[in-house]
Amino acid sequence: MVNIRSNENIPYPAYERICNRGFSHANRLYDFNRVKYPLKRATWSIEEPHVENRGSDEWERLSWDEAAKLVADTLKYNTENYGARSNLFLCSAGNSFGVYGGSFTGNSFANVNGYTTLDVCLDYGDLHGIGQVTGGGWDFNQRNMSGDYRFAKTLFIWDTNPPNSQPHNWHFCIEAKEAGSNLVVIDPTYTVAASQATKWVPIKPGTDPALGMAILNVVIANEWYDTDFLREKTCAPLLVREDNGHFLRSTDFGEDGPAQLPEYPFYGMLLLQASKANKVPTLEQTADYVVWDADANARGAINETANPALEGRYEVDGVKVTTAWTLLKEHMAECTPEWAEKITEVPADTIVELARMYAQDAPSTIYAGYHLYDNCEVMGMTWATMAAITGNIGKKGASIGHLGKDKPYLNRTPDLFPNGLTGLANDIPWLALNEILETGQYLGKEFPVRLLYNVGA
């Protein structure tokens, strides 16, 4: 490797810049301690692995052909003697899409052969939280392309420092500011990003959910929400049963309806139009969800009711229900700016101004970091709910998340499942692996582990 430079042939010159991880490849390639050749533990064989000798630091060098054959023979031996699921594949990490990454090929190989894949249980708080509201994972709940920032009138950079962590994206933020956008940085530290902000908001570490909920409180109290967006593109008008907290469905009354629809026992905004995301029902399936028809003063199906009520409590065939929007408003009523000030150390009047900027100086985008605090999934839910009630999602200049659509996560399904869903791999959480190795069981059933195929992690 002589030099690292960006792809000069891409159609969008603004995306030619390289991230820090890309620049680090030369150091990784020429690192003194890098393993450069295939190695096998000296006493190891497929039939007799001699696990007691692990840690002995005694190795035998193999040729690449020998190594490939050994892996193939081991996979075959394990499949024939212990079942395909005994081969575990871990093919995901920060290097998954770089020069040394193998996420696509490794997971595709596991899926085709019915091996077990390990879910690495990434502690991306905002990713999991946003996904609880919008549905889906990598493929849906992320912000627009970075070049879209210039269309945002307000850009929140929340607990991340792009000049250091994502310098290839930072210029988009500066260009948005130069175009007239409000550049708001929320961060406990006066970072490089904060030094360039229109407004810097220091906050007590770990208290971001309280700030977000107070912003929701202000938006709701001042009626700065987007009523049409709430009614047409979120779960706000859906009726929630008081007895079990689930959405009311026509099948609750013995009527025919789609089977096995997912439950969403939370008060946030489910974007019904995201029907192609991993966990969100299709538009046809949502016919099972029930709303209150404000014109007919009776219950109706979500896809057949032109004017569903956003607020109110009702009784449907003896079942007491409340709209999801009413529940959200009631839940946020206690989260006043004064309440949040005591927790976050952000002045109440600053919180009101943040809410006004986000809801009124729209379209607005939230550019977030990974958020690794143990309460950050709540922050992700809060961001998504902020976006949903103000209509700041799915539009030019309006989105949420830490990975943009200019990243390679979009539409990777054909690569992971080249033959469709035939031979789909088992999947277990990484956090359960120790217990599986110790007990040989998973969820109370026998689960042998004979091989861990680790790529880029």
Tell what function each PLM region has:
Residues 342:
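Active-site-adjacent helical/loop segments in soluble small-molecule enzymes
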